[in-house]
């Protein structure tokens, strides 16, 4: 199961945000436990346990950052839950361990919310591939679990090529052969 996102991860819609159950919180721990109740995968208890633990771990790490206030942390958690509801059903349809899906993101994380979501996905039984072909656009994600490969060449690609007709690549030998065919 593969999900491909190009350019940016669309922000949660007001409707998606309103579907997240929340209340007034007085502490970060209370907020995390309250919001974690939104993670429901009843058909697969193992997956629900993994998602719940990963959500709490990632948000606890986020709460340790200097200067994080409760409202900002709550907003980040709500964004994370909205994106989970949007993408995880596609990634984990009929999931059984040790199967893994793949989340491909072309363009790189542009803000802290996207970076948090990618960090969250990277801790799930998923492959996460973040492609940043344009060296002028920097990815703001920094994660100790991230395996990073950088190349000196830059390529201005805005959309992930989903159809083979969009990709036109040939070797020098191939092009020389085609040129000889026209003579």
Describe the residue ranges of each PLM region.
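Active-site and donor-binding regions of nucleotide-sugar-utilizing enzymes
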Residues: 62-150
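Conserved N-terminal ligand/cofactor-binding loop architecture of enzyme catalytic domains
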Residues: 1-79, 147-183
């Amino acid at each position: 199961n593969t999900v491909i996102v190009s350019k940016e991860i669309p922000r949660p819609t007001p409707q998606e945000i309103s579907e997240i159950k929340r209340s007034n919180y007085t502490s970060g721990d209370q907020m995390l436990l309250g919001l974690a109740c939104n993670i429901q995968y009843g058909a697969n208890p193992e997956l629900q346990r993994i998602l719940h633990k990963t959500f709490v771990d990632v948000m606890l790490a986020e709460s340790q950052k200097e200067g994080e206030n409760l409202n900002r942390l709550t907003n980040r958690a709500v964004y994370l839950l909205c994106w989970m509801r949007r993408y995880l059903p596609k990634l984990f349809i009929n999931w059984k361990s040790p199967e893994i899906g793949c989340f491909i993101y072309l363009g790189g994380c542009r803000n802290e919310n996207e970076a948090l979501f990618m960090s969250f996905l990277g801790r799930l039984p998923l492959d996460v591939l973040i492609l940043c072909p344009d060296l002028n656009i920097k990815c703001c994600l920094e994660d100790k679990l991230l395996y990073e490969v950088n190349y000196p060449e830059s390529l201005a690609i805005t959309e992930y090529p989903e159809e083979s007709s969009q990709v036109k690549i040939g070797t020098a030998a191939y092009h020389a052969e085609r040129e000889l065919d026209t003579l």
